[in-house]
Curated annotation (Swiss-Prot):
Keywords: Isomerase, Pyridoxal phosphate. GO terms for cellular component: cytosol. The keyword Isomerase applies. The lineage of its organism: Bacteria, Pseudomonadati, Pseudomonadota, Betaproteobacteria, Burkholderiales. Pathway: Amino-acid biosynthesis; D-alanine biosynthesis; D-alanine from L-alanine: step 1/1. It comes from Janthinobacterium sp. (strain Marseille) (Minibacterium massiliensis). This is Alanine racemase.
Amino acid sequence: MPRPLIATIDIAALRSNLALAKARAPHSKAWAVVKANAYGHGLERGMRGFAAADGLGLIELDAAARLRELGWNKRILLLEGFFDASDTKLLAEHRLDTVIHCEEQLLMLEQAKLRTQIDVHLKLNSGMNRLGFTPARYRAAYERLRAIPAVRHISFVTHFANAEDPDNPVLPVQEQVRRFKEATRDLPGEKSLANSATDLLHPAAAADWIRPGIMLYGATPGAQSAEQFGLRAAMSLHSEIIGVQHIVAGDAVGYGSAFVATAPMTIGVVACGYADGYPRHAPSGTPVIVDGVKTRMVGRVSMDMITVDLTPVAKPRIGSKVTLWGASLPIDEVANAAGTVGYELMCGLAPRVQIVEVN
C-alpha cells in the first residue's frame, strides 16, 4: 500500500477559476499562465483545465513544444522570450509567440533566418526594473522589430510590481499604467498589462489581454482571501495520522526539542515532510485539519513527517484524515503562517507525492 499522502487536482476548479478571471475582464482575451508545470498542478492538467483560454503563457520552451504534442492548437506565449539564437527556429516550428525584453533577444531575432512569421510582444520596463526596455529605448526597439521580415504582429506588454498592494506609495499601479500608455501612444497593436492581482483589484487595467496566473489555481497574490473572490482551490494535500503519542507538561516534541508541552497533550505524527514540499520553516501553530477539526502543527518539520496537536480532536487514531491545505484550509493561510506564499507551496510539491485528479 502506498504512503497515505495524496495531492488531489480539481480540474473543474481550474475551469471555474478561469471563467471567473475572464468574467472580471469581459472585453479582454486571456493568456492562462501554466509556467512551472502549471504551478505544480501538471502541464497536461492545466491545458485541459484551461481549454477555454485564448492562449497559454509559460517560460519553458520544451514545455511549449510539449503543449503542441498534447494537441494545444491555440496561441502559446513565451513570457521570458528565448535564450539562445538556436531557439528562434523553434519559435516558427511550434508557432510560438515570444516576448522580446532586451537588446540581445532583439539582435538574435534580427539575425535569424526564419521562413515563417512569428508574433512578438515587446516588453516595457515600466518601473519594476526586472525585464523590459526602458521608456527611452522602447520606440527604437519597436522600429527595429517592424523592420524584421519574420515579425508579423507586434504587441505590447508590461508587468506590475505592486498590483496586489493598492496602497504601495513607491510604485503604484496607476503610475506604471501612465508610463505604459505614454510609451505605447499611437502604436498599433494589442496590449497586455494585467496579472492576477490586476484582474482582481484593478480591472480597469485589463486592456486587450489579461495574464492570470495564481488566481487560476485558487489562491491570491495579496492579503485578500480567495474565497472573497469566489476562487476555488484546485490543489488539496491530504495525509493521515501514522503515529500517536501522549505527553505531559515538560515533554518536548521533535528535532531540537523545539516544542515543549505546557500541559498534557496528544500528539499525532503525519506522513508529510519537507521532502514532500511542506515548508520546512513552518513554525509551531501552522494550521492543519484532522478529522474535520482545525488544529496546529507543533515542533519542527522533518523530512518525511510533521507532528500536530491532536488534543482538540475527539477520537484521534492512526488513520485519522489530515488536510494540509485545500478547499477546507486555504493554501494562502498555510503559506502566511509559514512566512511564504501559496505559489511556493504549489510549485514545491515533490514528485514522490501521489496525484489524483477529481472532476
